[in-house]
């Protein structure tokens, strides 16, 4: 293999690797956005749960059923 053909081969590989790195970066950025949205949703669900527990009390505070 001549030095020129080796250089061409290495440049070709680098070009493909650059494309792959960019694609992977795009995926990581999108996953970061998804994670951020999910964190906001979980925080909202926790807030709603805590509000519901505050309204109805915890399980230990429930009055006995009427038939007792």
UniProtKB/Swiss-Prot annotation:
It holds the Pfam family SlyX. Transmembrane segments: none annotated. Belongs to the SlyX family. NCBIfam families: PRK00295.1. This is Protein SlyX homolog. It comes from Pseudomonas putida (strain W619).
């Amino acid at each position: 293999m001549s030095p020129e053909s080796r250089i061409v081969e290495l440049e070709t590989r680098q070009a493909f690797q650059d494309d792959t790195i960019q694609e992977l970066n795009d995926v990581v950025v999108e996953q970061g956005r998804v994670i951020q949205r999910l964190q906001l949703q979980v925080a909202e669900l926790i807030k709603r749960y805590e509000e519901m527990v505050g309204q109805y009390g915890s399980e230990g505070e429930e009055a006995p059923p009427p038939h007792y």
